[in-house]
Amino acid sequence: ELLGVTFDSYAGESFYNDKMGPIVEELKEKGLLKEDKGAMIVDLEPYGMPPALILRSDGATLYLTRDLAAAKYRKDTYNFDKSLYVVAYQQDLHFKQLFKVLELMGYTWAKDCEHVAFGMVSYEGQTLSTREGRVVYLDDLLHQAIQKARDIIEEKSPALENKEEIARQIGVGAVVFFVLYN
C-alpha cells in the first residue's frame, strides 16, 4: 500500500502443483527428458549449462518444474508480450535453464521471458532468507524509514508544513533507492 503497488492476480507456489504433471509429460513426449542416476533431467550441456533437473530420483518436483508450469500458465492465461522475473542475481543459472528448456519445448515466446537480476538484500550482516527464517517485512522496514525521516524533520525543520507526507515520501524513497542501488 505504501508503495502504491497493486496486483491483478496472485498465486502461490502450490497453485501450480496440478500443472507440473502435464509439463513433465510434455517434456517426455518431446523427447527432452533423460534419466540420470534415477532423476529426470533435460540435458543442457550442448548450450554450456549443467543439466536441468526436472524430477528428483524420488519423483519429487523442483523449482524448475514449477517455474516451467507457471510460465506456461501465465502465457496461456495472460498472453503476455514480456514476462519479467525480478529475482536475485544468484538465481541467474536457474532462469537461463528455465528459458532454454521453454525454448527447447518449442515455445517461441521463451524469448519474451527475461530475468531482471538484483543484489541480495541483507540486514544486520545477514542475507535475508524466508526459508531460513531470516525475514524483515517490507512494511516494517518502510515504517521504520518513515519514522526515521519523521524524527529528522522534527529535529531540523519542526515548522515544516505537510511533515507527515514528506516523511512518507522520504522514507519510502530511501528504501526504494537503497534496493535499486544495491
Residue ranges of predicted features:
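Alpha-helical recognition segments enriched in aromatics with Gly/Pro capping
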Residues: 1-182
